[in-house]
């Protein structure tokens, strides 16, 4: 059975999440096309019609990034498939960001990935989306207007896009990793490091995934040329799978995590510990967003249904 609150959540909604340690924000689309925010501050709240931050085309992809929740950016598509930005800055609240004014039109089936560049106090952003020629395009904000960045090459039409960013303690700039799916259904990585720029090679992390499966990624504990990454995707068994990158081991440990509805979107956040929180739809109240939690003592389902579902 559903609940009145769950019925407000779009089935197969885009999902995005940001955090500052265990202060959490989750974004989703309601059945009328509005983007809402649910939050966790020692308890779950919001997610109602009073917590709308933007309006987007129905079925829009969602991506979000933040700097300690002082600056939050949430990305979606307009009815005309133009990239748009809902922006929050502490002290000024929510407003429409400058991105829509740049008029970057993407493929109607594009997904979105987004990151603030790590290791700098400056507000520098990178967005990844799929153009109508099916290439993955980077869009950059360095404080002086939105511009096109590097083109990462052709991907499967409608591919999921995962992205994460950190700064190694011994590097003088940010590192970026982007994951997407190729026409042969492999899940692949493109890598950027400050001393090399974008690596030309594609690194395969999974040989065959369902076409257009959702992809999400996070990292934790950046150190001296060392990083820990977790990449998630929805596999053909309708469960979320996790692929681990651990320092000294590379990619290893590919396993199923938790069941979801077919075609569920996913979002992942992490913080020191490490602590991981994964958001998805698994059929609870039909369309509620649910949470999976990982900490040192093990993994379990977290909140069964985020507000407004219950």
UniProtKB/Swiss-Prot annotation:
The keyword Repeat applies. Beta-L-fucose 3 binds at residues 126, 138, 198. Beta-L-fucose 5 binds at residues 230, 242. Belongs to the fungal fucose-specific lectin family. Residues 1-310 are annotated as: 6 X approximate tandem repeats. SUPFAM superfamilies: Fucose-specific lectin. Transmembrane segments: none annotated. Keywords: Lectin, Repeat. Has six binding sites that are non-equivalent, and owing to minor differences in amino-acid composition they exhibit a marked difference in specific ligand recognition. Lectins have particular value as specific probes for investigating the distribution, structure and biological function of carbohydrate chains on the cell surface of animal, plant, and microorganism because of their specificity for defined carbohydrate structures. AFL is suitable for detecting core fucose on cell surface glycoproteins. This is Fucose-specific lectin. Beta-L-fucose 6 binds at residues 44, 277, 291. Beta-L-fucose 1 binds at residues 25, 37, 94. The keyword Repeat applies. InterPro entries: Fungal_lectin. GO terms for molecular function: carbohydrate binding.
